[in-house]
Regions:
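Structural motif in protein kinase domains
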Residues: 69-82, 221
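Catalytic-loop of the protein kinase fold
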Residues: 109, 113-128
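Conserved catalytic-loop aspartate of Hanks-type protein kinases
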Residues: 178
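Glycine-rich ATP phosphate-binding loop
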Residues: 1-24
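Activation segment/activation loop of eukaryotic-type protein kinase catalytic domains
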Residues: 122-162, 166
Length: 284
């Protein structure tokens, strides 16, 4: 995805560059592209969705064209510890980002006669505009639930969708699959990590972010997993009110990433709790 000028108007262009004759997903790519266009068109009016301007299927690689806000960038860039341009994401910013993405998922799950599962929510699918508003994009792996069904098989089995342990083993996705991947996104906002799998110096190897967080909680090392960059502009988080907000946020993220789908909350509850947390923050 990159920015260009189209008739003197700045736009973002995303090419489906994996479409080649020898591509392992060549047979399913057309379906993915059409799905992306259709679903994005249905939700493009939402504040937290990257606005679709159009598409072109006549290029060597099909392209999606989006509205481009100056100074917008990927969420991973804003979270990166290498970010030294002063654009730090505060605790309030991160709550707002989480709330915005939760609202989009809730809309997908509840606004259509056939609920839509986003299917591939990762931190790389989120951009942040110049006002700090999160913009979700890439609905190519979204899938509607069949009438009367609560689950559906992921036809693109070669893609690992972060939907939770059960989905990974069976290729079955549900609305709770989105809840799981959203919980992982919450953990990344909380810790400041830009990859769901990180290198752990203590273990001397790579570790999944959920396991990393749980291990530190068990060892009573809460301070070591909180991204201190959230508070550089306000000082530390010793305020009991702020600490409670952090604990509530972390608790919700862990509930979303429960092993059993039945133990995860619905997106309506997740979005409601996040809105309440966001309103309780007194500073940005």
């Amino acid at each position: 995805m990159f920015a260009v000028n189209l008739k003197e108007r700045p736009v973002l262009v995303k090419f489906y560059s994996g479409l080649t004759k020898n591509s392992s997903w060549n047979e399913t790519a057309p379906d993915r592209i059409i799905r992306d266009i259709v679903v994005t068109s249905q939700v493009s009016h939402l504040k937290n969705v990257l606005q679709l301007i159009g598409c072109c299927l006549e290029f060597a690689y099909p392209a999606m064209v989006y509205y481009y806000a100056p100074e917008s960038e990927f969420l991973t860039n804003r979270l990166s510890h290498l970010n030294n341009d002063g654009k730090l994401l505060s605790w309030k910013n991160r709550l707002t980002i989480a709330t915005g993405i939760a609202n989009v998922l809730l809309y997908l799950h509840s606004a259509f006669s056939a609920p839509i599962i986003f299917g591939n929510l990762t931190i790389n699918k989120v951009r942040i505009d110049q006002c700090g508003v999160a913009k979700l994009f890439d609905f190519g792996l979204s899938i509607s639930l069949p009438p009367g069904k609560s689950e559906v098989e992921n036809q693109l089995k070669w893609i690992h969708v972060p939907s939770g342990p059960q989905g990974f083993k069976s290729n079955i996705v549900t609305l709770k699959s989105d809840v799981y991947s959203f919980g992982v996104l919450m953990l990344m906002l909380f810790t400041g990590e830009t990859d769901a799998i990180k290198y752990d110096e203590e273990m001397g190897g790579r570790i999944y972010i959920l396991d990393y967080v749980k291990r530190h909680i068990l060892n009573n090392q809460f301070n070591q997993i909180v991204d201190q960059n959230m508070f550089k502009q306000q000082g530390n988080y010793n305020d009991p009110e702020v600490e409670q907000q952090l604990l509530d946020f972390l608790d919700l993220a862990l509930r979303c990433t429960e092993h059993d789908r039945a133990d995860r909350p619905d997106m309506i509850e997740v979005a409601k709790l996040l809105r309440q947390m966001e309103k309780s923050v007194r500073y940005s």
